[in-house]
């Protein structure tokens, strides 16, 4: 998440850090009333005293950058961003991703914005009834822990998500700090994991229907897969990050499937331990800004049966190719290239 060649906190890291709690500092004194308030022990902070629609000054932007690096995800409430303001804010932190394909609910004229609105655009997709689509999302890893676009060779560096319409209850999102999860492993397991790589593939864990399944055919025809290090070095903080999730990771390279399955289950359980997580209750006008290189998140699965819309808008910032502890970069397998969406 860089801008003008500078790291998100304005410094360059040596990349030698092995995990734990080395962070860019946060400063509540960057402007009148601006405060960064942690909300959990390892991850998450709420920032107050900032109007994101009012073109925050450079000092405030720097404080937000530092807070994202320190706390991995930051939250703002009561914001009045529109689509143009959302994109303009994102550009202060990096280059927004322009998606070639978006859902019908996404706003025209703003190709950087993707709108997630289950009730608006999922019914009838790929020959499925709306309730059938939601049922399979609930009962498969499509609702599982993930980073955004993790099967790409260059997953987004960060995501800025804005709430337009939220249900009166439910719909919370949960994030986990993967740097803290890595640091919490025992030293022998860290040393072992440092050497591993894994295949990340779109659609892992998807539950197909019997017979002709149009969505499975779609996934097979539009494969995206990369081999990533199982531990990546964060390009700005130098922290080692446990690069696992329940959606994209298919198998650890060089291991048998039973071995891979057992190790991935152990690592994912570590990555999602409650002490490394934070849960956010959305309100209209809420904004969450997270480091996609150091977190995974869990989309809510408790609203599909409710007759309440949940409309969210997101902008993702272009990322870099992950690098492992040995200095070796990720490698594309199929359907992906740096900067090509």
Q: Residue spans of the language-model regions?
A:
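Fe(II)/2-oxoglutarate oxygenase catalytic core
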Residues: 2-289, 293-341
């Amino acid at each position: 998440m860089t801008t003008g060649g500078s790291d998100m906190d304005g410094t360059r890291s040596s990349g030698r850090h092995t995990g734990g709690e080395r962070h860019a500092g946060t400063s509540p004194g960057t402007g009148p009333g601006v405060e960064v308030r942690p909300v959990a022990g390892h991850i998450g902070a709420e920032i107050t005293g900032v109007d994101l629609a009012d073109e925050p000054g450079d000092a405030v932007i720097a404080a937000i950058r530092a807070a994202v690096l320190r706390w991995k995800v930051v939250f703002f409430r009561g914001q009045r961003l529109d689509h143009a303001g959302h994109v303009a804010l994102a550009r202060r932190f990096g280059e927004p991703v322009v998606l070639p394909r978006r859902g019908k609910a996404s706003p025209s004229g703003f190709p950087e914005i993707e709108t997630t609105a289950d009730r608006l655009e999922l019914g009838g997709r790929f020959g499925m009834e709306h309730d059938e689509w939601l049922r399979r999302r609930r009962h498969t890893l499509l609702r599982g822990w993930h980073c955004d676009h993790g099967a790409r060779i260059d997953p987004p560096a960060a995501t800025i998500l804005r709430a337009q319409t939220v249900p009166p209850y439910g719909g919370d999102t949960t994030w986990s700090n993967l740097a803290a999860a890595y640091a919490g492993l025992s030293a022998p397991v860290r040393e072992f994991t440092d050497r591993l790589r894994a295949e990340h593939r779109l659609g892992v864990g998807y539950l197909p229907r019997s017979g002709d399944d149009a969505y499975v055919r779609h996934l097979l025809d539009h494969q995206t897969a990369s081999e990533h290090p199982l531990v990546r070095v964060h390009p700005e903080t130098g922290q080692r990050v446990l690069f696992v999730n329940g959606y994209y990771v298919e198998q650890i390279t060089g291991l048998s499937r039973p071995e891979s399955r057992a190790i991935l289950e152990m690592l994912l359980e570590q990555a999602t331990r409650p002490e490394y997580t934070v849960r956010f209750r959305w309100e209209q006008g809420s904004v969450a800004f997270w480091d996609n290189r150091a977190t995974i998140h869990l989309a809510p699965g408790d609203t599909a049966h409710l007759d309440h819309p949940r409309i969210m808008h997101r902008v993702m910032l272009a990322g870099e190719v992950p690098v492992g502890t040995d200095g070796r970069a990720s490698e594309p397998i199929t359907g992906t290239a740096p900067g090509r969406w």
